[in-house]
Amino acid sequence: MAEAPLHFPETECQRLEPHLPPPQSPETSPPSPSTLPFVTLTFATSLDSALALGPGIRTALSGPQSKAMTHYLRTRHDAICVGVGTAIADDPGLNSRLATTAAADVAHHTDGSSKDKNSSGDAITTHQPRPIIIDPHLRWDFTAESKVMRLAREGRGLAPYIVTLRQDLPTHKRRLLASLGGKFILLDAEHATGRFDWRAILSAVRQEGLHSVMIEGGGEVINSLLGENASLVDSVIVTIAPVWLGKGGVTVSPPRTRGADRPVARLSDTTWVPLGDDVVLCGRIAR
């Protein structure tokens, strides 16, 4: 049974607008000279900077209003990206359930248009983001019944592009992806350093015609971006939930160079948006 669509007020959409990628319309937008997409880093955290109670433990932090905001953000990006750990732990759908009233007139995108109705006749968003899974060593053992695949099959989302270093791609996995419109994206072996080569990943995403990507996690992905790759991030949108998860959680704490006498990264041009019991912090990485 289809999940109920979410609603996000137009007034709140406008407060977020300065921190979002410019709308893309193939009919009116000139080709972008950039080799990288617009990157929004977004996640929900506790008051003690934790994403989850522990590795592999799915932990709900966002309230209903900020959850609806996340689905609105998905309509404003061409792609949504998570790491393999999140794909394994959460079996995410990586789609948007936003009702069209909140987003239909806001943005035009390069692909991913779809529309569905629930049992009450509510129209669901006209745009779906392309899921991007970063899985260098093909750890994610997806099947036709994985949520993102099922949603793609039902027309309520898109099949993922899986970024990997592995050359020996399983034939049945490749065929399953292709049957739903997804595929593997192979990075060159020179990037097999055991670390995230974000410039290579983002360049590969842009080469697929995707102008913007929101990166949602998990912890290793977020920390690697906020560290030495912070210059690649255009916007940061963080939902802060009024809860402490306690010691042992997966935290946002990017690596700092030994002996460095300044913070790893700092936000500028900040906006605070209260949403229910949560508060959302929007900003840009200070250059």
Stretch-by-stretch model annotation:
Residues 1-287:
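Enzymes that bind and transform nitrogen-containing heteroaromatic metabolites
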